[in-house]
Regions:
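Active-site regions of metal-assisted phosphoester/phosphodiester hydrolases
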Residues: 1-163
Length: 163
């Protein structure tokens, strides 16, 4: 999506709820797709050798490096999957984020890493829904909040506002 800050890839997703062992390969694949997007190019469909009909004569664009991942990740902030997404926690300096990695928009906007309940695991409130933003976009996070009044799902919507 073209924004005032450049083109950004947005992903809406839902990872498996089964086990950490079934989610971790999904997390690793998301990170691989993100890191290799520039080399793989933009998504296209159909026969790209056609006369240019699909592109309406526009030149092929490159894949942007910036991305936002939104959705039900089915893991909690104390999980291995969360650490894989945003980096390890150090006792002195907080999370060590890879320059090509992601930040948790909820935390970057001032939310508590262990807080912000979006769903329940059994009868225990949990944060399973996230907005992960490319490290290169973290300064663009204006706000991130949970719509606690919404009742259209068993999860509460997580909203993200970027500059």
């Amino acid at each position: 999506i073209e924004t005032e800050n450049g083109v950004v890839r947005f992903y809406s997703l839902h990872l498996t709820h089964l086990t950490s062992e079934t989610r971790m390969p999904q997390v690793k694949e998301l990170l691989r797709i993100h890191r290799e997007a520039g080399m793989e190019g933009p998504p296209v469909c159909g026969d790209i050798e056609m006369s240019g009909y699909w592109s309406e004569g526009m030149a092929k664009t490159s894949a942007p490096g910036a991305a936002v991942l939104l959705g039900d990740f089915n893991f909690q902030p104390d999980s291995n999957e969360y650490t894989e997404m945003i980096g390890p926690l150090t006792p002195c300096d907080g999370r060590v984020t890879h320059p090509l990695g992601f930040v948790d928009a909820w935390v970057h906007a001032g939310g508590d890493e262990g807080g912000g309940k979006t769903a329940s695991v059994g009868s225990t409130p949990a944060r399973l829904d996230y907005a992960f933003v490319s490290a290169s976009l973290c300064d663009q996070i204006r706000s991130c909040w949970i719509d606690v009044d919404a009742d259209g799902s068993d999860h509460q919507p997580l909203w993200l506002e970027l500059n």
